[in-house]
Each structure stands twice: as C-alpha cells, then as structure tokens.
Amino acid sequence: MNSQILYEDNHIIIINKKVGQLVQGDKTGDHSLLELLKDFIKERDQKPGNVYLGLVHRIDRPTSGLVIYAKTSKALSRLTQMVKNREIKKTYWAVVPKEMIPQSQTLTHYLKKNEKNNKAIIYSHETEGAKKAILSYNIIKTLDNYILLEVDLQTGRHHQIRAQLSKIGIPIKGDLKYGAPRSNPDGGISLHARMLEFIHPVSKELIKITAPVPQNDAIWKACEM
C-alpha cells in the first residue's frame, strides 16, 4: 500500500489506484481501496479506534490513477464542495486506436445513464434527462497502432471520457463496453487519472500530483518514455 500513496498529510491522502481496485465498497462485496487504506493507516499509526476516511471523488474500477481521500470531516466537506465547483483540475491519459482525428479538439455531447447496464447513453444534441458533457483532448504521443491523448474534463459525467471518445470512433483500448475490439490482459481499460491540481482545503497551498502509469503494461510504459 505504501507504494500507492503519492501524497499524505494530516488532512488528505492521494492514492495511485490500480486497475481493478474499487474506490469504495459496492454491491459486489469486494474489498475496496477505502477499506484497505483504513486497515493500513490503523496498523501503521497504531490507532486504537476507527480510522476516519472519506472518498472525495470516484474513478471507474477498470481505470487506474489518482484518487483523493479525506482524513477529516472538515477536509471532506471542503473538497466535496471544490469538486462541485470544478476547483479541482483533473487530467487523464487515454490510449485509443490510431485513427485520423484532429490534433486537439473540444467535444460536447449529452449523456444519460442507463441504470440497467451501467452504461452512458450519448446524444449529439440536447435530450430530456441527458446532461451536458464537455471535454478537450490533445494528442501527445503516437505509437505504431495507438495514440495517447491527454484529456481535460470540463464536466464530470458517468463514463464521460469513455462514452465521448467512443462516439467519435476511438474507443479506449480494452473498453469492451464502449466498442473496443478486445479486452486488455489485466481486464482493465487504458484510461489513467494522470494529474490533479488544486488548492489544499486547509493549508491553501497549491497541490500538483502526477501518477505514474501502470508498469505491467508495455503500451503504457511506451507512452511514458
């Protein structure tokens, strides 16, 4: 667990989540990163009582990268409000098929969550019940069969990056749910929460964190070189 902790102080802890880890418990009953962290902190710090830890924001189970947890209720309250106010800048890396697309582009669509299959339905125009979704991307590396996109989110919708990139014909590598032709060996998708930038909720210092990509994947390693 130590190697996954990229930043920690008395108020927050930032983790580099592995593919397949749940950020918090769900109906599967699988052990989550939240529970693992609580157990780790309790043992490391020799805490006699319960460890307080609150999830600030989610990333999908098949993705990897940065997740913020709050260690106090005050920090959780402030950070949750910052997420709502778009005061936490999130940058993602996505590996997609090598197709002829613009070097950079802003995408605007409308997304509605299908609760039955946990998938986003995407529309090109305003639709009742659908929420506006905006992202911008820039191609930062070209490989033999893939390209690496740096993606900045302007909104935070369910499966937003996955759905919007699929809509323009470039589903994320390994993302069978949104049209990728085959799965990744680790069962995940090649979407990585790469960078976070925000003002610390208590100290007011600027926090900038970058998460290394999964090291067990040759494509990811080539992207980071």
Q: Which functions belong to the PLM regions below?
A:
Residues 1-225:
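RNA pseudouridine synthases
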